[in-house]
Amino acid sequence: HTLEWNWTDSYSYVLQPGPYTALEVQEATFEVDTSGVWETGPATANVHLSYWLPSNTEMGEQVPVIAVISPYFSYGQPGDESGATNVVGAGRGEFIYDNYIPHGYAFAQVSVFGTEESSGCFDYRGEGEGWGIHQAVEWLGQQNWSNGKVGLYGKSYEGATQWEAAVHGSEHLATIVPISGTTGLHPLLYKNGSAEARSQVMHMNYFGSTVDYNGDDLDNVCPDIIEGLFAGPVTYGMGELDPYMANYYEEREHISKALTNYNGSVYWVQGMQDWNVDPHQVFPWYQMFIDAGFDVRGMLGQWEHNYPDQWTKHNAQESGYGGEAIQNMTRWDWGQDLFEWFEYYLKGVGEKPELHAQIQRNDGEWRIEDTWPPLDRDFAEIPLDTCTQTGTRVQGVSVSGGSVSGVVIECGALSGDSDISISGLATLHL
């Protein structure tokens, strides 16, 4: 049997359109007690969100909510800002609006503290931000039109906010779908013995794009912002000697806390060629969540920092960096696949989805594994003295680019008589 997918848009669709329509957008602002999260910040702050209900709520039906929680509403410099929460977000917002509202889901867009019309400190990935996110999930799950189930969706920072929500373990948070979502700030920016150059300016870049450069900005400034401006450059320069590792970054590590506190399911989506939020943000946590009893499913493609169905971005990768997989990369079944996931975990409808990892090989072929990396793997070691090295390494380049490496190490085949499938990240011991 051949399924006919809708290929006419920039994102995928469900197989059958739903019977309902979206009602007019509604907005809500509610106050949150923040006296316990910011030592010198405001004692209260407001969360602002917008939401669209399906037309079946007019008949008294209660529906689940799919939400995107983000700093990116009204994001950017004054005069060049992105859309507010009351405008359906391009890409990920339109995908949810067009696919799932007609099937009886509410859709919400939430701005984190210190962004758009949400007040308080812009606490970049910090405790205050997570507290506001948790309160938004609680609010969505407690409305009289809600069935009490909330699912979160989004990529990158909008994937990180899902883990921030999971830390608090709301009874309303039934599932998360982090797409290349950051699980911890320190391992994002500092790994394998070195720091990324962007670590110096990440906090300032976000803060500079969320303020309006007027008197209202004073409400967005807290000690953690000042600390963040120092934490990045200090980490970049001092590495393991960085005194901020034990406090600033610990507060911004979410996944180990979610492992303890969260009670929902996880649909993990990750680009295996994503060098913005690279796969170590997911692995080995993927198996750890399975071991802890979570329902976990994965879609792991050779795309970069993109959605599974974002075909407009699945076209410019170089050989060895996903280029060989482009011809079979885009998942036009993503809308339907996710619909079945939401139906089960947010409505209790249909069969339980298979809990496996769909992993795309370098050559583009997709395979099914129980987990990733597979448990039945063997480790292979290659002594470097059997390899050849050419090139030079140049140190002392400006902080904007770090050192420049031109070293090439060539080693023999892992096996001379059989094909080898490599999974995971190779480790170099010097």
Stretches with model-predicted labels:
Residues S12-E61:
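N-terminal cap/lid segment of alpha/beta-hydrolase-fold proteins
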Residues T29, N315-H429:
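C-terminal, loop-rich substrate-recognition/catalytic regions characterized by aromatic stacking residues
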Residues E61-G141, T312-G322:
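Cap/lid segment of the alpha/beta-hydrolase catalytic domain
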Residues T85-N86, A90-I96, P102, E164-N261, ...:
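Accessory cap/linker subdomain of secreted extracellular hydrolases
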Residues G128, Y153-C222, I290-E340:
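A catalytic-pocket lid/entrance helix-loop region that shapes and gates access to the active site
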Residues N144-S156:
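Alpha/beta-hydrolase fold nucleophile elbow
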Residues Y262, W268-Q270, D274:
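Short beta-strand/loop motif that positions the catalytic acidic residue
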Residues W275-F283:
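Conserved alpha/beta-hydrolase "acid-adjacent" motif
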